Amino acid sequence: MSICIKDQIQNMNIVIGCTVGCAYCYARNNVKRWHMIDDFADPEFFPGKLKMMEKKRPQNFLLNGMSDLSGWKSEWRDEVFEKIRENPQHQFLFLTKRPDLLDFDTDLENAWFGVTVTRKAELWRIDALRENVRAKHYHVTFEPLFDNPGSVDLSGINWIVVGTMTGVQSRKVHTEPEWAWSLTDQAHMLDIPVFMKEDLVPIIGNENIIQEMPEEFNKVLEVQRSWQK
């Protein structure tokens, strides 16, 4: 039985708003529907949410499900990084589609920096991530997968996620199972864990789904379960 990645990683939207402007952006639609901020193209920082990091029970957090790291002001990033350093019990994930706009170093042991790649023409983002973000951990999210990315240089990558389009627009996109399997095989050749999102079940079958997490995330989940006993 497949699991939902949202049950393993909690969203903490410290910044809401994005300047990238993807046509299929679910976050923009949600912000407009719930009137979270006035202008989605003008990101806003919510420092009060940083208190969530102080909880002692370990958690895996995605910090920018409704923003792109490239749109964060440097002072926002510095404040968040300092809070991450103070709370090593958690693991924190960041995502960007514009790694070419980033340029920083960090030695944070519990921060993971990733890019979204939806097609072969966007593979440059992986190279830009490694070049512009000098960090301990990298991940790549291949979602929604619009075409066959082909051969991918995954050197230095610590985790990949693979998924397809969801919602009403899913009828316009067809992710071939061969694309997901090719990415999986390439990752496994480098001992990189692969998490296929549950929306791939109709495409590859529930019995074939692969849902692997990095060891650091698994340790967090194990401690969570022990707290529930």
Where are these regions (language model features)?
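Auxiliary Fe-S-binding modules of radical SAM enzymes
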Residues: 1-9, 146, 151-229
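Conserved Radical SAM active-site core
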Residues: 1-112, 120-134, 149-154
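Active-site-proximal loop/turn and secondary-structure-junction residues that shape catalytic pockets
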Residues: 67, 98-100, 117-119, 144-146, ...
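Nucleic-acid endo/exonuclease domains
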Residues: 72, 142, 176-177
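Short capping loops/turns at secondary-structure boundaries
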Residues: 118, 122, 173-176
